[in-house]
Design a protein with these regions (language model features):
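N-terminal twin-arginine translocation
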Residues: 14-19, 30-48
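A generic secondary-structure signal for well-formed alpha-helical elements
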Residues: 28-31, 35, 206, 346
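N-terminal secretory signal peptides
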Residues: 1-19, 26, 42
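Small disulfide-bonded, cysteine-rich extracellular recognition modules and tandem repeats
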Residues: 23, 44-46, 77
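Active-/binding-site microenvironments in catalytic and ligand-binding cores
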Residues: 48-422
Length: 422
């Protein structure tokens, strides 16, 4: 890309000069690297076809017929066995983890990337009732709190320190709220901010992954099948598909939206990431193949709408006009490789507000991946660090909350990667 194209796009929206120059320079560096031929970082990325082990099948957007979810013929029992609760996490074997670690070359600096959003009180979330909320409160013990602390919602346990050594301490609690649908105040959830959706999260009617039926495993405390106790931890190969970076480098500003209030670019609100985009992003990042047990992550720039906690940005983040992402054809194309997780920096992974959404289906990609394929979904992963350093292949690790019966984990994943020189 001619960096002037990016400068013109950013100046149109009055982005500050420092960001304009930095991003234009980065785009130019990526183009230079791409034109020179980016070498894969490991044996797993080989110089083969971008499709890797592509079956060559004909993948389409035809919705699965959920008129009779009890017809399990093509998706249950799972390829991993009739009683399986781990899904594609089964692909993350000891050998897979060892191969993933070989991505890191001896003697080269390794950077640790936090892929999680910073949570704050009032963090936005998909609207449900009862609401998904995050309202943290500090508790104090051992001294008199400052003026206004209690009035603002802080909690004083005692002003008296403990013991002869006058021990004082801080802890956190989480505020709860009443809902018209439930008589007991409810507090936070793992289904907020950066999260990894588990297989017990989404189904069709009574039916969930591997044919498990909701009435058979729903309990007051959580699910008795497909809960977080069957999920992690995992350490495996991660692959970044930088759709935003690729569009910037190619000068395709028509696929971009108005920048966030911090001046950072993002994909157009209802932009559908196609299979062709995926293959092009693999080539852009020097990724030769997607392998079983990989974690595949899409960067769209959507997380920049949370950077300043700006009301207008947050409204856009909630996606009243749509959100970029994949749809069924892309989900099915990726599922053939049996990745452990497919995720993005948006809160849904799948495209919203696009004409393909006009068929009346609600979050069909979630059903396709979680229920039919046992592939977990990552949401609101922060991918700017690896993208800025042109780290398209890395070691991915996450340990979701080890919470019995939970439907997701919102512990931030990490990536270990070796930055490329610009």
């Amino acid at each position: 890309m001619n960096p002037d194209v990016l400068r013109n796009y950013l100046s149109k929206y009055r982005t500050n000069r420092r960001d304009t120059l930095r991003m234009a320079g980065a785009a130019g560096a990526v183009v230079v690297a791409s034109s020179a031929g980016v070498q894969p970082a490991s044996a797993e990325t080989g110089n083969g076809s971008p499709a890797g082990t592509d079956s060559g099948g004909d993948f389409d957007d035809k919705p699965f017929d959920y008129a009779d979810p009890a017809n399990l013929a093509d998706w249950a029992p799972s390829r991993y066995g009739a009683g399986d609760q781990r899904g594609a996490f089964n692909e993350v074997t000891a050998a897979k983890t060892a191969a993933a670690l070989s991505v890191l070359k001896p003697g080269k600096p390794v950077r640790t990337y936090n892929l999680g959003e910073l949570m704050w009180n009032g963090f936005p979330a998909f609207k449900t009732d009862p609401r998904r909320i995050h309202e943290q409160r500090l508790t104090i013990a051992g001294y008199q709190p400052p003026p206004g602390f209690l009035e603002a919602g802080g909690v004083l346990m005692t002003t008296e320190p403990l013991g002869a050594n006058k021990l004082s301490y801080h802890e956190e609690r989480f505020a709860a709220e009443l809902s018209p649908l439930h008589p007991v105040p409810l507090a936070s959830t793992f289904q907020i901010a950066t999260q990894t959706d588990n297989l017990g999260h989404i189904g069709a009617g009574e039916y969930y992954y591997n044919g498990f039926r909701g009435p058979d495993f729903a309990a007051a405390h959580g699910v008795t099948k497909l809960g977080n106790e069957h999920m992690g931890p995992i350490a495996t190969r991660g692959v970044l598909l930088d759709i935003l970076g690729m569009k910037l480098a190619e000068g395709k500003t028509g696929d971009l939206a108005e920048p966030a209030s911090n001046g950072k670019p993002l994909l157009r609100e209802n932009y559908r990431i196609t299979v062709e985009d995926i293959k092009a992003a693999m080539k852009f990042g020097g990724i030769g193949r997607i392998s079983p047990g990989d974690v595949v992550l899409f960067r769209t720039g959507w997380n920049q709408l949370l950077a300043r906690r700006d009301a207008g940005d947050i409204l856009r983040w909630e996606a009243p006009n749509g959100m970029p992402g994949i749809y069924l054809r892309e989900a099915r194309w990726l599922a053939q490789f049996r990745p452990a997780v497919i995720g993005s920096d948006t809160w849904a992974l799948e495209v919203l507000g696009n004409p393909v959404n006009d068929n009346g289906s609600a979050f069909p990609v979630h059903q396709e991946l979680l229920m039919r394929n046992g592939i977990r979904i990552g949401e609101s992963y922060v991918l700017d660090g690896p993208a800025d350093d042109r780290v398209y292949e890395f070691v991915f690790a996450v340990t979701p909350q080890f919470s019995e019966g939970a439907t997701a984990g919102n512990t931030p994943p990490l990536a270990l990667g070796q930055p490329r020189r610009h």
